[in-house]
């Protein structure tokens, strides 16, 4: 569960390393974001050769959370970090590679490109 001012690692090669959540999208009173939700973020740390720079405001989809997510069969999946993938307006990732595992719930929310680029889907 992520909210405003939460810091996330970036799990792609778009150039950003760390981002800060400035808004959870999906409703006027929506407070928390979980896996598969879209958030507006600002880049706090970036590599000098990347396509996004420090201070850029972009959209991202949450791919891993420490809080985890509960599945229909009763199992819970949790990750070691909070991570997001920066996306373009057409909901495709801005980078060309995804680092680390992602949750299966992204497939249900139609982020097929992220699922196909990920090295492992849990």
Swiss-Prot record:
The keyword Ribonucleoprotein applies. CDD domains: Ribosomal_uL14 (cd00337). This is Large ribosomal subunit protein uL14. One of its GO terms (cellular component) is cytosolic large ribosomal subunit. HAMAP family: Ribosomal_uL14. It comes from Acholeplasma laidlawii (strain PG-8A). The keyword S-adenosyl-L-methionine does not apply. Binds to 23S rRNA. Forms part of two intersubunit bridges in the 70S ribosome. Part of the 50S ribosomal subunit. Forms a cluster with proteins L3 and L19. In the 70S ribosome, L14 and L19 interact and together make contacts with the 16S rRNA in bridges B5 and B8. InterPro entries: Ribosomal_uL14, Ribosomal_uL14_bac-type, Ribosomal_uL14_CS, Ribosomal_uL14_sf. Keywords: Ribonucleoprotein, Ribosomal protein, RNA-binding, rRNA-binding. Coiled coil: none annotated. Pfam families: Ribosomal_L14.
